[in-house]
Amino acid sequence: MAVCIAVIAKENYPLYIRSTPTESELKFHYMVHTSLDVVDEKISAMGKALVDQRELYLGLLYPTEDYKVYGYVTNSKVKFVMVVDSSNTALRDNEIRSMFRKLHNSYTDVMCNPFYNPGDRIQSRAFDTMVTSMMIQVC
């Protein structure tokens, strides 16, 4: 089950973070923040290959005892980070990839909104509803 979904700007500040157990919210914020170092490492290691292959999915960034952290980066260097419960062994890599594609499509809809200023926090009800449904769907 996805317990935290975050959208991080190109400059590494959060545009949107949603986590389900609210008592562990600070822990998830920390995990998302620390995963940005791994994202930057993977992007710099891939370099031109990332641009040439158009592979946006970064895969597993790092596992912890209770959670696994996955990453995805857009062409505009906006990063999506998803924290998944490690106990859910039925969740496959292609399912995570498809969740990131859904998230990317929804983020694109937010960006196309003429009333949204790029770089501001995402406060779209449609985006929030989609993230909530993704977190429930994976359970």
From Swiss-Prot:
InterPro entries linked: Longin-like_dom_sf, Sedlin, TRAPPC2L
GO cellular component: cytoplasm; cytosol; endoplasmic reticulum; perinuclear region of cytoplasm; TRAPPII protein complex; TRAPPIII protein complex
SUPFAM superfamilies: SNARE-like
Subunit structure: Component of the multisubunit TRAPP (transport protein particle) complex, which includes at least TRAPPC2, TRAPPC2L, TRAPPC3, TRAPPC3L, TRAPPC4, TRAPPC5, TRAPPC8, TRAPPC9, TRAPPC10, TRAPPC11 and TRAPPC12. Interacts with the heterodimer TRAPPC3-TRAPPC6A.
A UniProt-annotated Pfam family: Sedlin_N
Family named by the database record: Belongs to the TRAPP small subunits family. Sedlin subfamily.
Location(s) in or outside the cell: Cytoplasm, Perinuclear region; Endoplasmic reticulum; Golgi apparatus
Name of the protein in its database record: Trafficking protein particle complex subunit 2-like protein
Biological processes annotated in GO: COPII vesicle coating; endoplasmic reticulum to Golgi vesicle-mediated transport; vesicle coating; vesicle tethering
Gene3D superfamilies (alphabetical): 3.30.450.70
Keywords, sorted A to Z: Cytoplasm, Endoplasmic reticulum, ER-Golgi transport, Golgi apparatus, Transport
Role: May play a role in vesicular transport from endoplasmic reticulum to Golgi.
Upper classification of the organism: Eukaryota, Metazoa, Chordata, Craniata, Vertebrata
Residues in the signal sequence: none
